[in-house]
Amino acid sequence: MSREDNKETVRYFISEILEKGDMSKLRMVCAPNYINRMTGQGVGSLYEFNRVINKAIPDMHFKIESLVAEGDQVVVRYTLTGTYTGMVPGYQPTGKPVLIRGITYYRLENGLIVEHDPAATPDIWEVLGIKLAVTRLL
């Protein structure tokens, strides 16, 4: 696939799956061996993460600031905005605005996303006031 094709796949992934939460399109852009470095292995972990986040921030919007591709790799710089109005199990919504700036690395194979490695400031869980336990596997 060309760099432009890869960029378009990532753009589609952000707008249709992450922003709109249309998980029915997930397998159209993610390979069976997809891994998300934040949520865990496989599309199932992304599905669950997206379900929670789209419920918590129903008006979520991604503004792509820049999109750079080199070979099979695409890097996106974005701003995520919205309002924390929906329930997250065990936490009450604050009604506060959400503003997150992030950079995400994507790697594609044969036009499908195989690796998704997001980094954001502040972290999405921090914005929602959710404390996560850190577990170290030995």
Task: Please report, for each region that a protein language model flagged, where it lies by residue.
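C-terminal and inter-domain tail/linker signature
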Residues: 1-138
